[in-house]
Amino acid sequence: MSNFTPDACNVDSGLDSVLPPSLYALVFTLGLPANLLALWAAWLQVRKGRELGVYLLNLSLSDLLLICALPPWTDYYLRRDVWGYGPGACRLFGFVFYTNLYVGAAFLSCVSADRYLAVAHPLRFPGARPIRSAAAVSALIWMLELAANAPPLLGEAIHRDRYNHTFCYESYPLSGRGAALANVGRVLAGFLLPWGVMMLCYAGLLRALRGSASCEQRERRRVRRLALGLPCVALLCYGPYHALLLLRSLVFLVGGGSVDAGGGCALEERLFPAYHASLALATLNCLADPALYCLACPGARGEVAKVVGGVVAWAMGKERRAWGERGGNGRGCGEGEEVGMVELRGNGREFVV
């Protein structure tokens, strides 16, 4: 079933067929292999009994779920906000997409908190960081996020208007006061709370590093980059979308919570292109997370390098065989030139904090 909105705002979908599909295609193409590799590397950390690997594994899993939901949303934007897969698919892909935006933010804050406890209080909270505790925290996050994002599944998934839009999981103006209040809650609990935790952990890590004489300068820089990178990535990726979502919701509530088109539509129509662009920008977090993983687990970089080196070696070996079958010299290069096969390895040391 769908809901027809007779007094809908006349939003312009002209830019929707350009920026969001381009970003989604980029995230899908690069993010899928990167997060599969990060998922495998995080699993290796879990097998070694490292609690940080649990959070990174769940972060990669969340990113992969979001990435897998992108193809139908790409088609939605290419059609200029016309959902063509029915209300059931809209609920499914909308739920997966929006839930994993907030699951990702929650696990970024877990990584920050874990690094803070490891550096600032390694002996004071020994029971807070075993792998079973990390698994319990992860399960709690999934349950809370799934429950918090479930209510929209019970309402109307699709909203049609007289401007030939078939919106999925969104409407312009907002569908009611309850939706506006829920949006404010998402901004506060789903974005600002995790981001605040990251900032507090960053400040605490800086204090702990200044007071530590045993930590090498190189490791100080790495921990500092990780501690700053987490809140910066969250702010740059999630911040614009949540700022516009909060603005839309507050204006709607201040205006009396009416769904009638009127003064509120002027704001909705102005914000619409930036709002959809900011939502697409939020998915770039799926590309940043694997890079942050390498900062969080320097020992795993060698494992990742081995896989990449193996793939490169396999590809180059395949090219050599193909060249030989075509009558070449079997080297895969020109005459008198050989390929130097480089085996990529880690630096042989790990710094576990």
From Swiss-Prot:
<dbReference type="GO" id="GO:0005886">
    <property type="term" value="C:plasma membrane"/>
</dbReference>
<comment type="similarity">
    <text>Belongs to the G-protein coupled receptor 1 family.</text>
</comment>
<feature type="disulfide bond">
    <location>
        <begin position="9"/>
        <end position="265"/>
    </location>
</feature>
<feature type="topological domain" description="Cytoplasmic">
    <location>
        <begin position="212"/>
        <end position="215"/>
    </location>
</feature>
<feature type="transmembrane region" description="Helical; Name=2">
    <location>
        <begin position="50"/>
        <end position="80"/>
    </location>
</feature>
<keyword id="KW-1003">Cell membrane</keyword>
<feature type="disulfide bond">
    <location>
        <begin position="90"/>
        <end position="168"/>
    </location>
</feature>
<dbReference type="GO" id="GO:0004930">
    <property type="term" value="F:G protein-coupled receptor activity"/>
</dbReference>
<comment type="function">
    <text>Proton-sensing G-protein coupled receptor activated by extracellular pH, which is required to monitor pH changes and generate adaptive reactions. Activated by an optimal pH of 6.0-6.6, a more acidic pH compared to mammals. Ligand binding causes a conformation change that triggers signaling via guanine nucleotide-binding proteins (G proteins) and modulates the activity of downstream effectors, such as adenylate cyclase. Gpr4 is mainly coupled to G(s) G proteins and mediates activation of adenylate cyclase activity.</text>
</comment>
<feature type="topological domain" description="Extracellular">
    <location>
        <begin position="1"/>
        <end position="8"/>
    </location>
</feature>
<feature type="transmembrane region" description="Helical; Name=4">
    <location>
        <begin position="130"/>
        <end position="156"/>
    </location>
</feature>
<feature type="transmembrane region" description="Helical; Name=5">
    <location>
        <begin position="173"/>
        <end position="211"/>
    </location>
</feature>
<keyword id="KW-0325">Glycoprotein</keyword>
<feature type="transmembrane region" description="Helical; Name=3">
    <location>
        <begin position="86"/>
        <end position="121"/>
    </location>
</feature>
<dbReference type="GO" id="GO:0071468">
    <property type="term" value="P:cellular response to acidic pH"/>
</dbReference>
<keyword id="KW-0812">Transmembrane</keyword>
<feature type="topological domain" description="Cytoplasmic">
    <location>
        <begin position="297"/>
        <end position="353"/>
    </location>
</feature>
<feature type="region of interest" description="Extracellular loop 2 (ECL2)">
    <location>
        <begin position="157"/>
        <end position="172"/>
    </location>
</feature>
<feature type="transmembrane region" description="Helical; Name=6">
    <location>
        <begin position="216"/>
        <end position="251"/>
    </location>
</feature>
<feature type="transmembrane region" description="Helical; Name=7">
    <location>
        <begin position="268"/>
        <end position="296"/>
    </location>
</feature>
<feature type="topological domain" description="Extracellular">
    <location>
        <begin position="157"/>
        <end position="172"/>
    </location>
</feature>
<dbReference type="InterPro" id="IPR017452">
    <property type="entry name" value="GPCR_Rhodpsn_7TM"/>
</dbReference>
<feature type="site" description="Proton sensing">
    <location>
        <position position="165"/>
    </location>
</feature>
<keyword id="KW-0297">G-protein coupled receptor</keyword>
<feature type="topological domain" description="Extracellular">
    <location>
        <begin position="252"/>
        <end position="267"/>
    </location>
</feature>
<feature type="site" description="Required for activation">
    <location>
        <position position="145"/>
    </location>
</feature>
<dbReference type="GO" id="GO:0007189">
    <property type="term" value="P:adenylate cyclase-activating G protein-coupled receptor signaling pathway"/>
</dbReference>
<feature type="site" description="Proton sensing">
    <location>
        <position position="276"/>
    </location>
</feature>
<keyword id="KW-0807">Transducer</keyword>
<dbReference type="Pfam" id="PF00001">
    <property type="entry name" value="7tm_1"/>
</dbReference>
<keyword id="KW-0472">Membrane</keyword>
<dbReference type="InterPro" id="IPR000276">
    <property type="entry name" value="GPCR_Rhodpsn"/>
</dbReference>
<feature type="site" description="Proton sensing">
    <location>
        <position position="159"/>
    </location>
</feature>
<feature type="topological domain" description="Cytoplasmic">
    <location>
        <begin position="122"/>
        <end position="129"/>
    </location>
</feature>
<protein>
    <recommendedName>
        <fullName>G-protein coupled receptor 4</fullName>
    </recommendedName>
</protein>
<keyword id="KW-1015">Disulfide bond</keyword>
<keyword id="KW-1133">Transmembrane helix</keyword>
<feature type="transmembrane region" description="Helical; Name=1">
    <location>
        <begin position="9"/>
        <end position="45"/>
    </location>
</feature>
<keyword id="KW-0675">Receptor</keyword>
<dbReference type="InterPro" id="IPR002276">
    <property type="entry name" value="GPR4_orph"/>
</dbReference>
<feature type="topological domain" description="Extracellular">
    <location>
        <begin position="81"/>
        <end position="85"/>
    </location>
</feature>
<feature type="topological domain" description="Cytoplasmic">
    <location>
        <begin position="46"/>
        <end position="49"/>
    </location>
</feature>
